[in-house]
UniProtKB/Swiss-Prot annotation:
CDD domains per UniProt: Argininosuccinate_lyase
InterPro entries: Arg_succ_lyase_C, Argininosuccinate_lyase, Fumarase/histidase_N, Fumarate_lyase_CS, Fumarate_lyase_fam, Fumarate_lyase_N, L-Aspartase-like
Name of the protein in question: Argininosuccinate lyase
One annotated Gene Ontology cellular component of this protein: cytosol
Pathway assigned to this chain's UniProt record: Amino-acid biosynthesis; L-arginine biosynthesis; L-arginine from L-ornithine and carbamoyl phosphate: step 3/3
Taxon lineage: Bacteria, Bacillati, Cyanobacteriota, Cyanophyceae, Oscillatoriophycideae
Amino acid sequence: MTAKKTWSDRFEGSLHPTIVEFNASIGFDIELIEYDLTGSIAHAKMLAYTGIISPEEADSLVSGLEQIRQEYRTGNFNPGIDQEDVHFAVERRLTEIVGDVGKKLHTARSRNDQVGTDIRLYLRQQIDDIRQEIRNFQQALVNHAENHLETLIPGYTHLQRAQPISLAHHLLAYFQMAERDHQRLGQIRARTNISPLGCGALAGTTFPIDRHYSANLLDFEQVYNNSLDGVSDRDFAIEFMTAASLIMVHLSRLSEEMILWASQEFSFITLTDSCATGSSIMPQKKNPDVPELVRGKTGRVFGHLQALLTLMKGLPLAYNKDLQEDKEALFDGVKTVRICLQAMTVLLATGIQFKTDRLANAVAEDFSNATDVADYLASKGIPFREAYNLVGKVVKSSLAAGKLLKDLTLTEWQELHPAFEADIYDAIAPRQVVAARNSYGGTGFEEVRSALIQAKAILDHRKFWV
């Protein structure tokens, strides 16, 4: 039997069954139930504080709401599609538990400010959780960086070998990306942490409510100072999905590198059995499913951002049913970012091993030290552009002769330019090439060591909302 709608007394007929199903959001907004109960408890206490209901009535409402919370947690509260949404489902069950006093809970409140409150409480908690997961991801990066401060790896531009760098320097670049993500979410949290409770349907209420009282109970920092804006604002959700998209961009870039590094063509890392899968037909395969899935799920989060932007672009003030569509995009975006952060953290912690011998060979078998030859000449007083052009010719002739720069004899160097001396070999040795780049933020070992100390200091600061 279909439950009577809370608003149905205005109507003579009943909803068509197809429209009941089409209209219902209980299938996904049940995700908000814990936050709905928390918001309702604060609202009930505010109603008593302002004398709108008696303290005894508030106690009864709070007790009933806590009972529903316990029923939900133990699997004994499972509202069906006929309940329409989580708000009506809770109110109906509350009235069953406490009687007619349950009908007073919605005094001075609309579903519009109620759902806005729920979503903000939900997202605030999710932001806190995601920020901690970013910290876990950063810790995994730091752990590898500590172990590989002096491990060399080819640095690339245009996916062509450019200059050798410290592997730790490479990993700490992702630490910095994640740090921006962490800070960005902190800023968004502040704009999420504003209470719309008490805005009513759109115009406020005639009851003598105290919006700051309920906001304080819910740990909101502020209240909306315009009721129309309070019930219709979803900027915070769009901002979150923008930040989530950037998190996924960073995870996807790292994933792409992991996929390349695990290939036989690069062979920079080995995937452990804990984070790789096999082929159904090719027994030799070990597939990098984790980074491939992260790369694939990135587009999913981008899609949710586009969905929210498109949803909001044409909505007149204040609330419109379209806003029901914000939740599935937001919920799935949150879940996707969280599982991707968790999976990449596990991959870094237990799923990869760097092949240091292969990396050492990789930085010694190319011309990525050519810039250092030009720098060498420039340090001898030769204009850099002249030195640059000369080294280009050296590389060209060396390639034709099948030689690397390290293979040239001192005589051959001096035939190219008399400024070359025996110390050219030290200058172009991969370890020296890296060590010499000690400008601030560079890949020189001392600079990377300082960056590592700074990264560890950030992680040691456990007040992660700062």
